[in-house]
Structures are given as C-alpha cells and as structure tokens.
Amino acid sequence: MSLARILLVLALAAAPAGAQEGQFLSEAEAPHAVFPDADSVSRSAFEVTPALRDAVSARLEGTRASVWESQWIVFRAQHGTELLGHAVVVEEIGKHRPITFVVGLRPDGRVADVAVMAYREPYGGEIRSARFLSQYHDKGPADAVRPYRDIRNVAGATLSVEAASRAVKKAQALAAVLGLTS
C-alpha cells in the first residue's frame, strides 16, 4: 500500500463520523415542523424577567433543566379556528453547547411533536431522528421522560438525550406558567 493511501486511511479514521452540527429549521419553519396541519401561526416573544424565570424554575424543580435564555419564542398554531397548540422554542446544553429545540404542545399540555432546530455538538446528532423524538409524543407535564427508563437512549448521545428531555419539560413548564395549557 502506498504512503499516500495509508495517510488517507488514517485521516479518514481520525475524522468525525459525519456532520452532526447544523441549523436544521429556521424560526419560521419551526412551528410547522411540530404542527404540520397548521394553516396559521402567530409569534410571541416573552422576555425572561426574574419573576418568569423563578416561576418556570419552580415548576422544573428536580429536572436539572436550565433557565438561562433571555427570551422565549412561542408560536400559536391554528387550523382554521381550531387551536392545535403552541410551539415553544427552548435551548438546553448538550455536552458543551446549546441545542435548540421546538416543542409542540397541545392545549392539554401533552407533546404533539419535538424537532431539533439547531445542533452544535460534533457528536450525538442522532437525536434528530424521528424514531428517537417520537418517544416524546403524548407525554404530559406529569409524565417522566428519564433517559434509560422512560426514553430509550441513543448510544454516544447520552447528554444530548438528557438535553432533549429537559427541553420538553422546560417547554411544558413555560407553557403552564404563561397559561397556554390546561
């Protein structure tokens, strides 16, 4: 085998398995990713005041979710006059960097769908798969979403799986505090 070929094989072996990082949904696409039947969406931005931060944090007690954003974006999704729910954009830290999620919540607070908007880690991007994210469908605010127990883990993506679970709980807590869910 030639030296060039050996160097190429070594370089490929040392390279990351694939591009995990990226922006996958724009803010405009996000509500339609979790509510594909929506024919109208309206956007609201909520500045994170100390009172709002404390109220959301109180609902998250025991979940290890972080409340560090300066604002939260929430979309009201409708089909005709029917309220489908709210799409809540939240971020949670993966291993080193934030992962941006959009969590679709039905009016009763149960998860309609979850999507990854932006993934900034070199590994663990498999959590973007529909197979993984479908585990959150129909989970309510009182339902546990613990990796290895309630949610199947993704090999090599444990911290990203934990971030997804925290993001779902954070979105549910925020929606409840804002009075968007029952």
Residue ranges with predicted function:
Residues 19-154, 158, 162, 166-182:
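Flexible, solvent-exposed loop/hinge segments and secondary-structure transition points
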